[in-house]
Design a protein with these regions (language model features):
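Acidic, low-complexity, intrinsically disordered interaction modules
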Residues: 16-59
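Short glycine-rich, low-complexity segments
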Residues: 1-29, 66-70
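Structured surface patches comprising rigid loops and adjacent beta-strands/short helices at the edges
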Residues: 39, 58-71
């Protein structure tokens, strides 16, 4: 997925997290991850803890979809 688009979505969700509970859904070709604690990114990848408290690290090209919703 486009790196700038992913970063913009993460920024919006992390800002909203200060006001309302936020849930991220991150989709890859084979998996779907749920995150409730915010996502972190740099120029190469995105990191987060999923709903099983496993640390997940994904390259931008592995992400096929990302969305934000209320818990």
């Amino acid at each position: 997925m486009n790196r700038q688009l992913v970063q913009d979505i993460i920024n919006a969700g992390n800002k909203a997290m200060n006001i309302v509970p936020v849930k991220y859904v991150i989709k890859t070709k084979d998996d779907k991850y749920y995150c409730y604690d915010g996502l972190y990114y740099d120029d190469n990848h995105v990191e987060f803890y999923d709903d099983y408290d496993d640390k997940i690290s994904l390259y931008y090209e592995d992400i096929v979809g990302i969305r934000i919703g209320n818990r």
